Amino acid sequence: MSWLTPEIIDVLIAVLKAVVILVVVVVCGALMSFGERRLLGLFQNRYGPNRVGWGGSLQIVADMIKMFFKEDWVPRFADRMIFTLAPVIGFVSLLLAFAIVPITPTWMAADLNIGILFFMMMAGLAVYAVLFAGWSSNNKYSLLGAMRASAQTLSYEVFIGLSFMGVVAQADSFNMVDIVNAQEHMWNVIPQFFGFLTFAIAGVAVCHRHPFDQPEAEQELADGYHIEYSGMKFGLFFVGEYIGIVTVSALIVTMFFGGWHGPFLPPFVWFALKTAFFMVMFILIRASLPRPRYDQVMAFGWKICLPLTLLNLLATAAVILYNAQ
């Protein structure tokens, strides 16, 4: 075992941490799908899934078994290679986007000095999965849904980047750990409230969640860009959407609500509680808000979110300049 040097041991520990964290994220995404159906049932005065296992607790397992054994059908005129590659790209990019989130001071999949830029890169890569899925399916509804999704995602990613810039300017770092440590005495949500508001709205839009789910509007597009997908390919898109929700919720906590900081309880517990709160908010938004028209969604972004983020960035720069004098 002479090859097992301290450096190799450190690398193995880092890889093991990353694998554990990413597996937990996938499990959290699957659990959220069950929690969403139960909470929507509660909000809408119905039962929700309650047949498989005690209180429906094994519904996730039943769904996984069903997806695994469903026919993996590919449309006759589809581009088979791109059609197969699209859900993999979407799932992997959304999963890797979580890698830069620090759960505790020592637990994170990747501690990068350009953590925020890495997240923006992975979020941008997910757009290709949607475009590939819509184009390769050779279906007009699928292509229209993909065009909607790509335009919406690219638009709202601009607002995400601008809302991050105020936090980066205050913390003087792109590193997520440095940003969390800068909130030890005051959370960023207080000086950066408009940045938080814009990021929360844009995060819902980028995840294609209600009320910004026009790319998948069942009444208009018959389920949008993944209309032709079935089996595990559809499962990757399905779980990937919930992984995106977990990632956005964790980023809200990290960037604006102090990350793992909190009194009395261990850092991991604080991070988990804060993230779970915002995941429930995603579900509550779906249960309570109507779906606007697509042109209203785009107009809201460019006419309201963009000026709001620019004003927030201008005010942040003015405060930093004043304090430096």
Curated annotation (Swiss-Prot):
InterPro entries: NADH_UbQ_OxRdtase_su1/FPO (IPR001694), NADH_UbQ_OxRdtase_su1_CS (IPR018086). It is a multi-pass membrane protein. Keywords: Cell inner membrane, Cell membrane, Membrane, NAD, Quinone, Translocase, Transmembrane, Transmembrane helix, Ubiquinone. The keyword NAD applies. It comes from the Bacteria. It is an enzyme of class 7 (translocase). GO terms for molecular function: NADH dehydrogenase activity; oxidoreductase activity, acting on NAD(P)H, quinone or similar compound as acceptor; quinone binding. It holds the Pfam family NADHdh. One of its GO terms (biological process) is aerobic respiration. It catalyses: a quinone + NADH + 5 H(+)(in) = a quinol + NAD(+) + 4 H(+)(out). NDH-1 shuttles electrons from NADH, via FMN and iron-sulfur (Fe-S) centers, to quinones in the respiratory chain. The immediate electron acceptor for the enzyme in this species is believed to be ubiquinone. Couples the redox reaction to proton translocation (for every two electrons transferred, four hydrogen ions are translocated across the cytoplasmic membrane), and thus conserves the redox energy in a proton gradient. This subunit may bind ubiquinone. Belongs to the complex I subunit 1 family. PANTHER family: NADH DEHYDROGENASE SUBUNIT 1 (PTHR11432), NADH-UBIQUINONE OXIDOREDUCTASE CHAIN 1 (PTHR11432:SF3). NDH-1 is composed of 13 different subunits. Subunits NuoA, H, J, K, L, M, N constitute the membrane sector of the complex. HAMAP family: NDH1_NuoH. This is NADH-quinone oxidoreductase subunit H. It comes from Photorhabdus laumondii subsp. laumondii (strain DSM 15139 / CIP 105565 / TT01). The lineage of its organism: Bacteria, Pseudomonadati, Pseudomonadota, Gammaproteobacteria, Enterobacterales.
